[in-house]
From Swiss-Prot:
<keyword id="KW-0539">Nucleus</keyword>
<dbReference type="InterPro" id="IPR020479">
    <property type="entry name" value="HD_metazoa"/>
</dbReference>
<dbReference type="GO" id="GO:0000981">
    <property type="term" value="F:DNA-binding transcription factor activity, RNA polymerase II-specific"/>
</dbReference>
<keyword id="KW-0217">Developmental protein</keyword>
<feature type="compositionally biased region" description="Low complexity">
    <location>
        <begin position="188"/>
        <end position="197"/>
    </location>
</feature>
<comment type="function">
    <text>Sequence-specific transcription factor which is part of a developmental regulatory system that provides cells with specific positional identities on the anterior-posterior axis.</text>
</comment>
<keyword id="KW-0371">Homeobox</keyword>
<dbReference type="Pfam" id="PF00046">
    <property type="entry name" value="Homeodomain"/>
</dbReference>
<dbReference type="InterPro" id="IPR001356">
    <property type="entry name" value="HD"/>
</dbReference>
<feature type="compositionally biased region" description="Basic and acidic residues">
    <location>
        <begin position="177"/>
        <end position="187"/>
    </location>
</feature>
<feature type="DNA-binding region" description="Homeobox">
    <location>
        <begin position="211"/>
        <end position="270"/>
    </location>
</feature>
<dbReference type="InterPro" id="IPR009057">
    <property type="entry name" value="Homeodomain-like_sf"/>
</dbReference>
<dbReference type="Pfam" id="PF12045">
    <property type="entry name" value="DUF3528"/>
</dbReference>
<keyword id="KW-0805">Transcription regulation</keyword>
<keyword id="KW-0804">Transcription</keyword>
<dbReference type="InterPro" id="IPR017970">
    <property type="entry name" value="Homeobox_CS"/>
</dbReference>
<protein>
    <recommendedName>
        <fullName>Homeobox protein Hox-A11b</fullName>
    </recommendedName>
</protein>
Length: 283
């Protein structure tokens, strides 16, 4: 097919719809030409009147229209085309026919394209709404959709600040958290008597609400010394209790309550051991 196309000259009387070349009539002299250019050579009858129909362009003009060939001297003018297509087609035709002045053409026709597009949009959709794309009839959907989105960022900072707000500081609780050294410092700075791990202290605030004081556990050093003393004697006398309280920087009441709790714990452990051995006779 390529060899046949290369040796056939361009611009003969016969048109092939699959390619842009023309075949001379001498090659096919015995066959009648198809797709004639004159409409009178192929009369056809229609069931409707053709006088009211708009004039249709020929096949040659439609096929060469997209290739930007200057056919003003051969073909009829396209004054009957729609206005929107004629404007855009002329702009693209000028750009393609003058490839060297592409930048100039874009700069010259920028305002023309802008105004023509706005005029076409105004004719098709009427007045454009606040969203810039849809008509004014869609403004109610635009406001309901994007109005909630715009109001959301104003609500989030309030929630974030409320969630990030620190809880009210409790009296004597700052020194109790942290390492063992900070706990020991708290015990030195608060010499008032307390009831150890199980003690609950209530401090009345300005609004009359009672809050529980945070528990201050014993340090490892204090527990080790108390366990050592408990190993020698389950019940501690007053002199030994005062000595331990001064050495461990605790109050007398704290040492006393610790021994009470430790005795209850030891009693529970003994009961659990007894139950374990009685339920397992093999041991």
């Amino acid at each position: 097919m390529m060899d046949f196309d290369e040796r056939v000259p361009v611009g003969s009387n016969m048109y092939l719809p699959g390619c842009t070349y023309y075949v001379s009539g001498t090659d096919f002299s015995s066959l009648p030409p198809f797709l004639p250019q004159t409409p009178s050579s192929c009369p056809m009858t229609y069931s409707y009147s053709t006088s009211s129909l708009p004039q249709v362009q020929s096949v040659r003009e439609v096929s060469f229209r997209d290739y930007a060939i200057d056919t003003s001297s051969k073909w009829h003018s396209r004054g009957n085309l729609p206005h929107c297509y004629a404007t855009e087609d002329m702009v693209h035709r000028d750009c393609l026919s003058n490839p060297g002045t592409l930048g100039d053409m874009l700069s010259k026709n920028n305002s023309v394209l802008y105004h023509s597009n706005t005029n076409h949009a105004s004719n098709m959709y009427g007045n454009v709404g606040r969203n810039g794309v849809l008509p004014q009839a869609f403004d109610q959907f635009f406001e309901t959709t994007y109005g909630n989105v715009e109001n959301q960022p104003t609500d989030h900072p309030v929630d974030r600040t409320a969630s990030k707000a620190p809880p009210p500081a409790e009296s004597g609780s700052d020194s109790c958290r942290g390492t063992d050294e900070t706990e020991r410092c708290e015990e030195t700075s608060s010499p008032e008597p307390s009831s150890g791990n199980n003690e609950e202290k209530f401090s009345g605030s300005s609004n009359g609400q009672k809050t529980r004081k945070k528990r201050c556990p014993y340090t490892k050093y204090q527990i080790r010394e108390l366990e050592r003393e408990f190993f020698f004697s389950v019940y501690i006398n007053k002199e030994k209790r005062l000595q331990l309280s001064r050495m461990l920087n605790l109050t007398d009441r704290q040492v006393k309550i610790w021994f009470q709790n430790r005795r209850m714990k030891e009693k529970k452990l003994n009961r659990d051991r007894l139950q374990y051995y009685t339920t397992n006779p093999l041991l």
